[in-house]
């Protein structure tokens, strides 16, 4: 035997159900943006005029672009990153070279901090809870490689891309007793380069 319900109860029940369906649709629709990984990032090409010569290898970097990570893979809070194409060549040398993230430093005269964390992206860790970046780049003799270099600027509550549009940014590479400096006058500018 069926029970009768009032019109008011019927409308409240169907309204709540419709609201739940709409909310789940919105959450499903935005899930991809919050689970973003750097897999699909494309870095701007490097300018061949900006190459620095270390004697046994050359290095070059393109202009910076920006990416904000997912809190899912960053311990609960999203991070801001700069990234750029980074090219290394040993084409005119019989030697191979390995460059580590520790050979590179980032500085900004406007006070923003950043740490070079990756020379290419590997994927997620086995638990699917954290990004895994390559911390070194090895280039064999008479060879060349281009990877995406990643700079972690910190959490979104402590860093801002906006501050990088003013002031000067530098990326410094120290290797083989030499120091190369790539200088950016703004976030969207190609760098100038020098070596000593």
Identify the meaning behind each predicted range.
Residues 3, 9-30:
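N-terminal export signals
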